[in-house]
A protein has these predicted regions:
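Short structural boundary motif marking the start of a folded domain
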Residues: 1-4
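Short beta-strand/turn micro-motifs composed of small residues
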Residues: 7
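Short N-terminal binding/cap micro-motifs at the start of the first secondary-structure element
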Residues: 10-14, 38-39
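Glycine-rich beta-strand-centered segment in the early N-terminal region that forms part
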Residues: 18-34, 48-101
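Cytochrome P450 core scaffold surrounding the K-helix E-X-X-R motif
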Residues: 39-45
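Secreted/processed peptides and extracellular or luminal domains of membrane proteins
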Residues: 43, 100-103
Length: 104
């Protein structure tokens, strides 16, 4: 699959990367749309040196939508099925931006 890979601050390229296999209670999604938001632009710029990301390379884009294409063991017990349309935001709070400082 293709992904935008940030190699270092301000250094990025489109690369072929392996398609991950879903683990137990996980699903594999085909991403149909993804955004690069303000947080991603700060990460790409290297605005949080020594904190986030802990190391490069990274694949940015934590706001996405798509569909489930494969279930990991046990995922069906949570109600997931192939073909489900899904959306997600998969990031932890950074702890240093204004929103985190204000508890938002």
């Amino acid at each position: 699959m293709q992904a935008l890979v940030v190699l270092a601050p301000e250094r990025f390229e489109i690369q072929e990367v392996p398609v991950p296999a879903p683990g137990p209670m996980e699903v594999l999604c085909r991403v149909k749309a993804v955004s690069i938001c303000g947080t991603d632009s700060h990460l790409i710029a290297g605005d949080y040196p020594g904190f986030w990301p802990p190391e490069f390379p990274i694949i940015p884009g934590h706001e996405w939508s798509g569909e489930i294409v494969e279930l990991g063991p046990g995922a069906e017990k949570a109600g997931w099925k192939v073909g489900d349309r899904v959306a997600g935001t998969s990031h932890d709070a950074c702890g240093v931006c204004q929103q985190c400082i204000e508890g938002r």
